[in-house]
A protein has these predicted regions:
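Conserved beta-strand/short-helix segments
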Residues: 1-301
Length: 301
């Protein structure tokens, strides 16, 4: 397993829930387990084999069967390592329920990506307890963000960001710890930014119409991070200062040893949400790979 997080109410039963990632489950396809909270008087001691997690309506009719918790799992395709990182996404689609953000760094030839699984009252009525991540958009259960280029490992680290743009919906962070950036900003044919494995962190703004959006060549609810900051995908991109900084993650090739992105809350008391971005291999003041952390203040009215 990778990490576990508490969630707000994902299935609209008035209780907080849990999410646990297992990127090596199912022979490396990976899985993300969402475990529903239960009232105290219904909790009994015991061990839960997490792969046996089930929804209440699908449990055995055998009265001797013991259910410690109900829940559901999101599963990846072979080799995707779904569940490398996960977090509470807040209310990303403005429906009043909590959502879950899950990273999948080896998705689509290691471009990587992340999924947002929308909370819903109807979850308990589903007839299956394993849902393929690829089916989220077509079933109206969530959306997928895809990395830009092969080897970017987008989704190696993900984090809920709170409401950065102050529009009433929460936002998310997705790190791509192996991405290189080459940009000609003024169109003169000369690269203004040329940084190998500097890494980028994408800030994606939440919105109520996310499932109807699509970037060119994709189905609705499936968006390429190449379009960040456009009308297709409102948000922003943070770029590592130097080659090899690994902004947002690092050390392990899939960023599996650091948690380099996080919400900082309102750190300066201005009523706006701030961000923390770590660059584990940055070399400040000639200190080789000492690392840096950037505190980015929230903007807007």
């Amino acid at each position: 397993m990778s990490n576990a997080k508490g969630l707000r109410d994902f299935n609209a039963d008035g209780l907080v829930d849990l999410v646990i990632g297992a990127p090596l489950a199912h022979q490396g396809a990976g899985a993300c387990y969402i475990i529903f909270g239960r009232p105290r008087d219904m909790i009994m001691g015991g061990e839960l084999q997490i792969e046996e997690l089930s929804l209440g309506m699908n449990v055995s009719d055998d009265p001797r069967a013991v259910r410690i918790f109900d829940g559901i799992q999101l599963v990846g395709a072979p080799g995707e390592r779904l569940g490398q990182s996960q977090d509470d996404a807040g209310d990303f689609n403005a429906d009043g329920l909590g959502d879950v953000l899950i990273g999948s760094p080896l998705l689509n030839n290691r471009k990587g990506g992340a999924a947002v699984f929308f909370g819903a009252r109807e979850i308990a009525s589903l007839t299956q307890t394993e849902i393929p991540m690829a089916e989220l958009p077509s079933r109206g259960l969530g959306m997928i963000f895809e990395g830009q280029d092969d080897g970017d490992f987008a989704g190696a680290r993900v984090a809920g960001a709170g409401d950065i743009d102050r529009d009433g919906t929460t936002d998310i962070l997705i790190a791509a710890p192996n991405r290189s950036v080459r940009l000609d900003l003024d169109g003169d044919g000369v690269l203004d930014i040329d940084r190998t494995e500097c890494c980028v962190v994408y800030l994606v703004y939440g919105a109520p119409d996310l499932l109807t959006r699509a970037t060119p060549g994709n189905e609705p609810g499936r968006l390429s991070l190449a379009y960040i900051g456009t009308t297709y995908l409102p948000g922003a991109m943070f770029i590592g200062r130097n080659s090899g900084d690994h902004l947002g993650a690092g050390l392990g090739i899939q960023g599996d040893r650091t948690f380099g992105i996080a919400s900082a809350g309102d750190s300066n008391g201005d009523g706006k949400r701030d961000l923390l971005l770590g660059a584990v291999d940055a070399s400040p003041r000639d200190r080789a790979k000492a690392g840096e952390v950037y505190l980015i203040y929230g903007q807007g009215e």
